[in-house]
Regions:
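Alpha/propeptide regions of enzymes that mature by internal proteolysis
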Residues: 2-175
Length: 175
């Protein structure tokens, strides 16, 4: 346990963080320097995507629970694993279809030259989780979704709109 505590005191480059823990101005995740949040939603379908990203990779941890969690790459954030870092975190509606949003953000990060360097390859680490919002009986136009997944497009918009000023409440994932 002490080893884990010491690991989390180090930044991505293995240096001790110079940031001292203190309450932020707004008490939001974006009070942490470099962290940004973006949302996008499609109100016609009733779904959305939220992207949390940073200027640099950031420390993150996860505890997945429930009978049918929809996740991608969250195992790398569990305390017993060695990575504990992410380039972005994606939260999306769309149930399993919403996991497309993670791939879009990974593509955008790679285009921005952000990610874990493996030789000449850049591998952005983008864990994500989805919620079930596919209430088919409430959405008679739901079959239109299957022609082209809207979650990649929503993820693109959320990533590109990420900043320190973001809407609070039912926006993005969970709109």
């Amino acid at each position: 346990v002490n080893v884990i505590k010491e690991l989390f005191k180090l930044n991505y480059d293995g240096e001790r963080s110079k940031v001292k823990p203190a309450p932020g101005n707004k008490n939001l995740i974006t009070d942490i320097p470099g962290i940004q949040v973006g949302h996008a939603e499609d109100n016609k379908i009733g779904t959305g995507v939220t992207v949390i990203t940073g200027d640099k990779p950031f420390s993150a941890a996860v505890d997945v629970r429930g009978g049918g969690p929809g996740t991608r790459e969250t195992d790398m954030l569990s305390l017993e694993n060695s990575i504990g870092r992410a380039d972005a975190i994606v939260l999306s509606g769309g149930s399993a279809f919403g996991l497309d949003a993670c791939s879009e953000v990974q593509d955008l990060l790679r285009q921005d030259n952000k990610g874990y360097k493996v030789g000449k390859a850049i591998v952005p680490l983008v864990p994500g989780a989805v919620i079930f919002d596919l209430n088919i009986n409430d959405k008679p136009h739901i079959n239109a979704i299957w022609k082209l997944s809207p979650w990649r497009k929503l993820a693109n918009k959320a990533y590109k709109s990420a900043n320190t000023d973001f809407l609070l409440g039912s926006f993005g994932a969970g709109c």
